[in-house]
Swiss-Prot record:
InterPro entries, per database record: Pex19 (IPR006708), Pex19_C_sf (IPR038322)
Source species, domain of life: Eukaryota
Annotated family: Belongs to the peroxin-19 family.
Protein name per Swiss-Prot or TrEMBL: Putative peroxisomal biogenesis factor 19
Cellular component, GO annotation: peroxisomal membrane
Cellular location(s): Peroxisome
Region (Disordered): 14-70, 104-124
One GO process term, biological-process aspect: protein targeting to peroxisome
Length: 335
């Protein structure tokens, strides 16, 4: 082994020993720093300089303090307005806030209009319902001593009728009809021409509502339910002649359905799924049961039949249209 090899071997051994030396740890109140002294050894051999590798010190910094979700949320909420004030200015921020409130209230008012009120009666319609209830109470001879009680019994029925789309308020027409009734009949009662006309208009509106398939599908069912409650155990105070005319109109309508509905079902059975045609047949059975009641028992109609009718849902649109056309034709012929 020559001198150069001996020197190189010594340098390698020295470098290995330096790497294995223990590190010195210095502790302060804030940070802990671990360093390894940088040792530089210079050995001159035949004018050659050898410098061992240097180990760089590492610094272990403590992690920043963590904030919980609640702390961050509170910080954001508390500082948000201050940040907006600095960016926009306090006056601009106030104007924006006032503008937001104005637009918000405007949207709320627009959504509360009758057209966007989910089909519910507006405040104006509710007032008209009260007025109509008073007129109906007078027309039907309702008094505090009658079985019907006060006119509040009419209001749920009228409100449901409004929801179903079957009641249009026209004060001029209503007042004219009321005045004509008073002229034609000094006693309290319903003028049959006006009554039939109103029923016809109501049927048309109900059919249109059903054919449009609006979101208020429960409106007609609720209408039947309230009509059932109104009729249950109540005796309308009507003049004998007028009572007979109203009963005749009711019986003719039921008779038409009992006679024509089964044939219509058979002709259109292929146009509907089996579960629908089964529902139609159940409806037809109810109409037949009502039609078979003895004459003079219309005012004692079993409310359970009306409840079952309500549960079975609406009549088919095309059958309703045929029924309405027939009723309108009969009214035109009478006029």
């Amino acid at each position: 082994m020559n001198l150069d090899d001996l020197l190189n071997s010594a340098l390698d051994e020295l470098e290995t020993q330096e790497k294995e030396q223990p590190t010195t740890t210095k502790t302060t109140t804030t940070t802990t720093t671990t360093t390894t002294s940088n040792t530089t050894k210079t050995i001159n051999n035949n004018n050659n300089t050898v410098t061992p590798s240097t180990i760089k010190p590492t610094y272990n910094k403590p992690p920043p303090p963590s904030l919980g979700n609640d702390d961050l949320l509170n910080t954001n909420v508390n500082d948000m307005m201050d940040i907006f004030k600095k960016l926009l200015g306090e006056e601009t921020l106030k104007n924006l806030d006032a503008g937001f409130d104005k637009e918000y209230n405007k949207d709320i008012n627009n959504n509360s209009d009758d057209s966007n009120n989910g089909g519910l009666p507006s405040e104006e319609d509710k007032k008209k319902i009260d007025e109509l209830a008073e007129k109906l109470a007078t027309m039907f001879g309702v008094s505090e001593d009658s079985d019907l009680g006060d006119m509040d019994n009419f209001k749920p029925f009228l409100e449901e009728l409004t929801k179903a789309g079957g009641l249009n308020f026209n004060n001029d027409e209503l007042n004219n009809n009321s005045n004509n009734n008073n002229k034609n009949n000094n006693n309290s009662g319903v003028h049959i021409d006006n009554f039939e006309s109103s029923i016809s208009d109501t049927l048309k509106n109900l059919a249109d509502n059903a054919s449009n398939k609006t979101d208020n599908n429960g409106g007609i069912d609720d209408l039947f339910s309230n009509l059932s409650k109104l009729m249950e155990g109540q005796n309308f105070n009507l003049d004998g002649e007028e009572t007979g005319q109203i009963n005749d109109l009711f019986e003719e309508s039921i008779q038409f359905m009992a006679e024509n509905y089964p044939d219509w079902i058979e002709k259109n059975i292929d146009h509907y799924p089996p579960e629908e045609t089964e529902r139609f047949k159940n409806q037809s059975e109810i109409f037949s049961m009502i039609a078979q009641q003895k004459e003079g028992e219309a005012d004692m109609l079993d409310s359970g039949l009306l409840a079952r009718m309500s549960q079975l849902g609406n009549l088919p649109d095309s059958f309703c249209e045929d029924s309405i056309k027939k009723v309108e034709t009969e009214i035109d012929e009478k006029e």
